[in-house]
């Protein structure tokens, strides 16, 4: 479903002649293997690569394409991890900042990527992940 939606939006942006920005949602799992989650990791790596390919194809058309790869965020998706002492310890051991991200932090990253403040960004995946890739 992602590809048809992206292609329709890209076509509308190009036809309008107005520069545009597309933001995809990947995950830290695009870069970091998670045991027992091969399907999720592979699909998110695919989103990151699709972002790069579309950015290369669409840059000349004034459409920027980027992605966000969140770490552990306080959402229903991480509720079971947060509720389980062992799961929570595992998540925090991977997150140097020692806390879960907030949904608003992901929203603010999207706002940045959609704004003119990021006009020279294209083909990038930003990782708001509490320092997960610092070491």
Model-derived regions: residue spans:
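Alpha-helical segment proximal to the catalytic Tyr-Lys
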Residues: 11, 56-60, 119
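Active-site helix of classical SDR
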Residues: 6, 43, 51
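A conserved structural motif in NAD(P)-dependent oxidoreductases
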Residues: 95-106
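Short, flexible catalytic-loop segment of classical short-chain dehydrogenase/reductase
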Residues: 31, 48, 69-80
């Amino acid at each position: 479903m992602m590809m048809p939606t992206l292609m329709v939006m890209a076509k509308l942006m190009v036809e309008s002649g107005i520069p545009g920005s597309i933001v995809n949602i990947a995950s830290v799992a695009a870069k970091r293997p998670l045991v027992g989650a091969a399907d999720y990791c592979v699909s998110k790596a695919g989103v990151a690569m699709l972002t790069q390919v579309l950015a290369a194809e669409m840059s000349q058309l004034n459409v920027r394409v980027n992605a966000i790869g969140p770490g552990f965020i306080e959402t229903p998706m991480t509720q079971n991890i947060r509720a389980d002492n062992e799961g929570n310890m595992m998540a925090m051991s991977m997150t140097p900042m020692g806390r879960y991200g907030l949904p608003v932090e992901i929203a603010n990253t999207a706002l940045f990527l959609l704004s003119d403040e990021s006009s020279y960004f294209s083909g990038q995946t930003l990782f708001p992940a509490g320092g997960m890739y610092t070491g």
